[in-house]
Amino acid sequence: MRKTSLVTILFAMLITFLSACKSDSEEGGTTGKPYDPNQPIKLTSFYPENGGMATKVIINGENFGTDLSQIKVFYNEKQAAVVRSIGTKIYVITPRQPGDNCTITVEVGKDKASFEQQFSYKTQVTVSTITGTPRTEVNAVDGTLAAAQFGLTHFVCVDREKNIFVCERSSYRLRQINEQQNMVTTLATNITAPFIPMVETEGQKVFLPLWVQGGNLLQFDPETQWAKKQVKPQNVTLDQYISAAVNPEDKLVYIKALNGNLAKMDPKSKEAELVTTGLDAGWTYDAICCFDSLDPDMLYICYRSKHCIYRYELSTGNYVLYAGAREDPGYEDGKRLNARFNFPSQICFDLNGIMYIADSSNHCIRSIDREGAVSTVIGVPGRAGYVDGTPDDALFDEPWGVAVDEEGTIYIADTKNKCIRKLAIQ
């Protein structure tokens, strides 16, 4: 009833807003007075006082003018879409995730004013299933999203065209999902020891490291219809590749080997050089690498079987424990070094520098913010299952893989459910 009442109020406000536009047009031939640069803009109120992404808000005040090219509205640092202005009212759309408590600022020309009262942003988190049938016995069916079936879905990545790539590690396959085309396709089968797929910085080529003697990378390129091609870094000898990550600044692919060596490779020429040695040589074959999206000098390595995450600084060679405790599994949110994980697997960063972790044996997705606080995004710690919905309801069964696209949508390889899930945080 409360939600219905709010919708009714907002609808009434919108009708009032449009009526004001119409009345003003009938009286003066324009939709409001133009902005007067010799007078200050004034803010009086806004409504509603809280909401989530795409909430429609009306800002009341004076001297806004009607030229939308001169009007900007910000929720903290995030710019809102301005739909209409009649000089005394501005109609805006709330942007995605501007922060929990938002200062609304209006800029008109060179004039600027901010409300003292803050807008309370309500984050909405939901998970849905893109494709796959939970716990199916059939594990290799291509076709539509509804018809497709998978083996154990271990790792995932996504390109700029929103193609989703899924490594079925124990079934030795790489699959491609295209939501827009409603299609799942197998790109390669009988792959020896495939690990975590990654997309290079141009958002096109996909590289798949192989954990084999001598090491290998498989390359999949849309310009060759995703045909599989075997490539090796030149001038560097690595053994048993276990993970690769692209650096957002130098655009090079960094490859970690089981023997602890770290090399960097030009994805075009394949020229490579050794970066360092001794990064926990032979410690574990499940080491998943990812660069910080805001600080490309920092490479993070998640050691699944050791239940912790390390950080390697390229410029100094400093290598330290970043989150969790070595060989101490468990579940605890809080400060990163006090937090506990249980077989954390794939990690990724969104464009805001938030790290997401597929905490597989805790059956949930965790995050680490820029202040180092660990929290549970979705899933019930210690409880396996399959349920779509909100954080209070959603269940996973050992999710190993997580990836995020440029819009902040998170893709989850829900391993034992044999599904690919989508997490929307708005």
Language-model regions: role of each:
Residues 17-20:
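C-terminal motif of bacterial Sec signal peptides marking the signal peptidase cleavage site
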Residues 22-129, 159-165, 175:
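Ser/Thr/Pro-rich low-complexity tracts
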Residues 59, 123-154, 181-195, 223-240, ...:
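Gly/Pro-rich loop segments of beta-rich domains
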Residues 109, 161, 169-170, 209-213, ...:
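Short loop/turn segments immediately following the C-termini of beta-strands
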Residues 158-161, 200-203, 246-250, 292-296, ...:
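Residue-level detector of Asp-centered blade-edge/turn motifs that repeat once per structural unit
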Residues 163-166, 205-209, 252-256, 298-301, ...:
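Conserved beta-propeller blade signature
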Residues 172-176, 215-219, 260-264, 307-311, ...:
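A short loop-to-beta-strand structural motif that recurs across blades of beta-propeller domains
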Residues 397-426:
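Blade-level signature of beta-propeller repeat domains, shared across WD40, Kelch, NHL, RCC1
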